[in-house]
UniProtKB/Swiss-Prot annotation:
Family annotation (Pfam families): RNA_pol_Rpb1_1, RNA_pol_Rpb1_2, RNA_pol_Rpb1_3
Organism superkingdom: Bacteria
Keywords noted in UniProt: DNA-directed RNA polymerase, Magnesium, Metal-binding, Nucleotidyltransferase, Transcription, Transferase, Zinc
Enzyme Commission no: 2.7.7.6
Binding site for Zn(2+): 70, 72, 85, 88
EC class: transferase
Any one of the GO BP annotations: DNA-templated transcription
Cellular component aspect of the GO annotation: DNA-directed RNA polymerase complex
Protein name per Swiss-Prot or TrEMBL: DNA-directed RNA polymerase subunit gamma
Encoding gene per record: rpoC1
Subunit structure: In cyanobacteria the RNAP catalytic core is composed of 2 alpha, 1 beta, 1 beta', 1 gamma and 1 omega subunit. When a sigma factor is associated with the core the holoenzyme is formed, which can initiate transcription.
């Protein structure tokens, strides 16, 4: 099979038309035979263990089960590549085509798509401008709906009728002297399909815009919601009636495999059971329609087909959940793609990527805000290509093999080269779940011992991280553009404000707040140290470090700078014989000469507050 490579910018998910679904699965063989429709519920033959033709694992539709071998065995080996066997109709190709070739089931009666009926909000109910309960009553054959009131005076468009009401109207229509004409009533998904087909989206949108101008409150909000849905349908070119399915795609068989266990039994994907229910009910309905069975029996079979398709698309969304062995609910298509273990989050978004690592985070109190501590063991693995390149460029080694051996030996030269490599090379840190853009930020790595990533405590609120065992992923931006982008846009020190609220997201919390409080707190129960005077801040800190002073003890320390303590009270004044004065305030003592010039000033503080203030001043100065 040729390797297909195609560049694309985005993936668009939209409604598929019945023609598009058939196009996915239909192929024309060289003999003119059209294949693709799955008509039988069988999977594999219990005697030959080969897939049944036109069944859920059919080789004619999905491709051969074995590489380069047709179903009947007439053609084997790669030399027959591309030949379609005239006996069994199977194309001789690789078996991996069974991973992407699709089939389809043509339904004997339309059914609604449960996502659009029972989703929140219900797009079907919004488009039809009907309550969801009424739409459900129609879909599940509990009520009739008026498709065309004709000239009946008591009927209106989209009016719901019970069985008895419809029978009375029917009798009235078929009376010999009846003048009623053009009355049309429907039930089930066919009626919903007709109502959706009758919608003129452009006219509805224009009318809604007029109504919105003249309405307010709850009614206006409802009209805007409906207009938004209609505008989306117009913009995407999707037709509302496509929400009612007439064809169901059958996903490739290798994505819903059937494998033989040791005891001879088979394990199969739940999807096969759900598809089998749909095919059985669809075939039975087609047979009942052929033999012109009574309407009540046909209607019941249509309802059962609707429920089977609902279970296939989203088991348990409406009605009873379909269960398999051991009363375990069967996994439907929705269950496979939704949630943490689903296809998107587990296999597409959650892929393992190269140049990435993962480890537990611990607090790094000595780091600057734009730095993170990266374990040496992790750094040498992540930056290995860069290290090897530099080793060869500096002619320390001659080739890649020698460089790798040097790394494996933990040669001391390696760490010097690694230091050079990581200098100025930012790394990205990500903590799942990444709920906003600050869930991934860039940091300058600092090599640390141990096996844990060190993180600055200030960036924790942005990541919603704490240090009780949280893990974070590290990614290395490779290209110059990626590195520049990481440095300019994603560096932690450039993301101080929350993009959502505009308020600071880098705020001190937990240990930092507690530390600041502890340093600046008072302790009135301590012995009185207020008779101690110190010449400067350094003397106070030295006395504390030598154990002569507690952290929270009040002392007097000389400070000749300006003090703004907000104290407006009158000081207690003591005048000396030489004319000098001592002015005693609550938190400072000022000595002046006879001319009122200040000689000295002492302020009342604690060693803790001095340490706190010095730390702040040093940080501001740097």
């Amino acid at each position: 099979m040729p390797r297909l490579e195609q560049r694309f910018d985005y993936v668009k998910v939209s409604l598929a038309s019945p023609e598009r679904i058939i196009q996915w699965g239909q192929r024309t063989l060289p003999n003119g035979q059209v294949v693709g429709e799955v008509t039988k519920p069988e999977t594999i033959n219990y005697r030959t263990l080969k897939p049944e033709m036109d069944g859920l694992f059919c080789e004619r539709i999905f491709g051969p089960a074995k590489d380069w071998e047709c179903h009947c065995g007439k053609y084997k080996r790669v030399r027959h590549r591309g030949i379609v066997c005239e006996r069994c109709g199977v194309e001789v190709t690789e078996s991996r085509v069974r991973r992407h070739r699709m089939g389809y089931i043509k339904l004997a009666a339309p059914v609604t798509h449960v996502w659009y009926l029972k989703g929140i909000p219900s797009y079907m109910a919004i488009l039809l401008d009907m309550p969801l309960r009424d739409v459900e009553q129609i879909v599940y054959f509990n009520s009739y709906v008026v498709l065309d009131p004709g000239n009946h005076p008591g009927l209106s468009y989209k009016q719901l009728l019970s069985e008895d009401q419809w029978q009375d109207i029917e009798e009235e229509i078929y009376r010999e002297d009846s003048e009623l004409e053009g009355v049309e009533v429907g039930i089930g998904a066919e009626a919903i399909q007709r109502l959706l087909r009758d919608l003129d989206l452009q006219a509805e949108a224009d009318q809604l815009r007029q109504e919105i101008l003249n309405s307010k409150g709850q009614k206006r909000a409802k009209l805007i919601k409906r207009l938004r849905v209609i505008d989306n349908f117009i913009a995407t070119g999707a037709k509302p009636e496509w929400m009612v399915l007439t064809v169901i795609p059958v996903i490739p068989p290798d994505l819903r495999p059937m494998v033989q266990l040791d005891g001879g039994r088979f394990a199969t994907s739940d999807l096969n059971d759900l598809y089998r229910r749909v095919i059985n009910r669809n075939n039975r309905l087609a047979r009942l329609q052929e033999i012109l069975a009574p309407e009540i029996i046909v209607r019941n079979e249509k309802r059962m087909l609707q429920e089977a398709v609902d279970a296939l698309i989203d088991n348990g969304r409406r009605g009873r959940t379909v269960v398999g062995a051991n009363n375990r609910p069967l996994k439907s298509l929705s269950d496979i793609i939704e949630g943490k273990q689903g296809r998107f989050r587990q296999n597409l978004l959650g892929k393992r990527v190269d140049y990435s690592g993962r480890s537990v985070i611990v607090v790094g109190p000595k780091l600057q805000m734009h730095q993170c501590g990266l374990p040496r063991e992790m750094a040498i693995e992540l930056f290995q290509p860069f290290v090897i390149h530099r080793l060869i460029r500096q002619q320390i080694v001659n080739n890649i093999k020698a460089a790798k051996r040097m790394i494996q030996r933990n040669d001391p030269q390696i760490w010097d080269v690694l230091e050079e490599v990581i200098e100025g090379h930012p790394v990205l840190l990500n903590r799942a779940p990444t709920l906003h853009r600050l869930g991934i930020q860039a940091f300058e790595p600092i090599l640390v011992e141990g096996r844990a990533i060190q993180l600055h405590p200030l960036v924790c609120p942005a990541f919603n991280a704490d240090f009780d065992g949280d893990q974070m992923a590290v990614h290395v931006p490779l290209s110059i553009e990626a590195q520049a982008e990481a440095r300019m846009l994603m560096l932690a020190s450039n993301n101080i404000l929350s993009p959502a609220t505009g308020k600071p997201i880098i705020t001190p919390s937990q240990d930092m707040v507690l530390g600041c409080y502890y340093l600046t707190a008072e302790n009135p129960k301590l012995p009185d140290y207020s008779d101690r005077y110190y010449a400067n801040f350094q003397d106070v800190v030295m006395a504390y470090e030598q154990g002569h002073l507690p952290l929270h003890a009040f002392v007097w320390v000389r400070y000749d700078g300006e003090v703004d303590d907000g104290d407006t009270s009158e000081p207690q004044i003591t005048t000396y014989e030489d004319g000098s004065r001592l002015l005693e305030y609550a938190l400072r003592r000022v000595k002046e000469d006879a001319n009122g010039q200040r000689i000295s000033q002492y302020i009342r503080t604690t060693p803790g507050r001095i340490i706190y203030n010095q730390t702040i001043q040093e940080a501001l100065a740097s």
